[in-house]
Regions:
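Repeated scaffold domains used in trafficking and secretory/extracellular systems
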Residues: 357-360
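Bacterial N-terminal signal peptides that target proteins for export
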Residues: 1-8
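Acidic, Gly/Ser/Thr-rich repeat motifs that build Ca2+-stabilized beta-propeller blades
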Residues: 21-197, 241, 249-256, 301-336, ...
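Repeat-solenoid scaffold signature
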Residues: 231-262
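C-terminal motif of bacterial Sec signal peptides marking the signal peptidase cleavage site
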Residues: 16-19
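Surface-exposed loop and turn segments in beta-propeller and other repeat-based domains
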Residues: 96-114, 162-176, 216-233, 271-299, ...
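Sec-dependent N-terminal signal peptides
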Residues: 8-14
Length: 403
């Protein structure tokens, strides 16, 4: 189980924290030292350092929420893992269940909530403006995990034409992956886990332990490393966060086993080493051509699930770590304007211990962040106010650089 792991790593940190041992600390490697050095030296961008967050509670008493996709008007389509239901959460805090048409019952009938499995990721076709939206869902069934497509009608709060577009993804009570997201190229990316069998991650014929790239019809997307395969990258243990920065660079968060959790920059066809390598700088990984993470944490401090990537940072919602990690993107927009990929600043934590387990994070339309807590999933402790539980909640964060 990813966030009930024992053991604390002694981390040997490369480059920025080279040579430090003894106390568990996050580590950082910058793949763009020129951009990093120039941004850090100038001191011109206050977002290169830590930020603080003002927090508002938008909605509460959500039953085991897992994924969320943004709709126009700062509304969010949220999946409930165990109930296999969908709801639209409005900025006012109103929560409307999606219970019209035949789709919701079909979704319940074919979803199996088993441990970490159930109704997981959700994505909305980015070109849709409503009231009809094409939505994509990742669910655990009796035999496999699958990606589904359906039509969402916000006027009638209905779901219809539920269709399986990709199946055969290994399933288990643990390590199901589940995050799905549209990339800037217009294709759908699917994060899968090794389903408790590490060999899946290194098997090119298995869809487990991979990041997949498909068309909206579920076919391998044009330009994939193997034209006949949906596999985009491999060697993953359990990816649950996907995002892209303004330079088009792709990021993924990944659960480690008992040493190190990871933030990776994803390249097509690359192998990220699981189960041979966990974390950075291992000679076996270097010799085998595995890719190192760009940032890593002891598992006690992270267990990263969803991520959000903005112009100024990568944000990781952490379960066992009960905090929101921020990795600054040094120089942000100015680095991109100069044709550089921003480097990485020192990771720092927000919301540490304040709201418990954090499952997902999304960027809003006005620079704010939205964060889903996850204390009702059987591993957390729901918060009680006035004698009744208030978890789980959708939080809105306003961010300000620390002067």
């Amino acid at each position: 189980m990813d966030d009930f792991r024992a053991g604390v790593a002694v981390v040997g940190v490369a480059l920025l924290l080279s040579g430090c041992t003894g106390s568990p600390e996050p580590g950082v490697v910058s793949p763009s030292p020129t951009a990093s050095a120039s941004a850090a030296a100038s001191g011109a961008d206050p977002w290169d350092g830590p930020v603080t967050a003002d927090v508002d509670v938008v909605a509460q008493e959500l039953p085991v929420p897992w994924g969320m996709a943004q709709l126009p008007g700062d509304r969010f389509l949220v999946t409930m893992r165990d109930d296999a239901t969908l709801a639209v959460v409005h900025p006012s805090g109103d929560v409307e269940p999606v219970d019209g048409s035949e789709g919701p019952q079909q979704l319940v009938d074919q979803t199996v909530a088993d441990g970490e499995g159930g109704l997981l990721g959700v994505a909305v076709e980015p070109e849709d403006s409503g009231p009809l939206f094409t939505v994509f869902l990742y669910r655990t069934g009796e035999r496999d995990n699958a990606v589904l497509r359906a039509e969402l009608d916000l006027d009638g709060m209905g779901l219809r034409d539920l269709t399986t577009i990709l199946d055969g993804i290994p399933r288990s009570s643990n390590h199901n992956g589940g995050r799905i997201a549209f990339g800037p190229d217009g294709y759908l990316y699917v994060a899968t886990g090794d389903a408790g069998d590490p060999a899946n991650a290194q098997d090119p014929e298995s869809l487990g332990g991979k990041i997949l790239r498909i068309t909206p019809d579920g076919e391998p997307a044009p330009g994939n490393p193997d034209p006949g395969s949906p596999v985009w990258s491999m060697g993953h243990r359990n990816v649950q966060g996907l995002g892209w920065d303004p330079s088009g660079r792709m990021f993924a968060s990944e659960f480690g086993q008992d040493r190190l959790d990871e933030l990776n920059v994803i390249e097509p066809g690359a192998n990220y080493g699981w189960p041979d390598v966990e974390g950075p700088g291992e000679s076996a990984g270097d010799q085998a051509g595995f890719r190192d993470p760009v940032v890593w944490w002891p598992t006690s401090e992270a267990s990263p699930s969803g991520i959000a990537v903005t112009e100024e940072g990568v944000y990781l919602a952490s379960l066992r770590g009960e905090r929101l990690w921020r990795v600054p993107l040094l120089g942000g927009p100015s680095a991109v304007a100069d044709g550089e990929s921003p480097g990485f600043g020192e990771p720092h934590a927000l919301l540490e211990g304040e709201f418990g387990r954090l499952r997902a994070v999304r960027a809003g339309s006005a620079g704010e962040l939205y964060v889903l807590t996850n204390n009702t999933d059987g591993r957390g402790e729901p918060m009680i106010e006035d004698g009744r539980p208030v978890d789980d909640r959708l939080l809105r964060l306003g961010l300000t650089p620390v002067e």
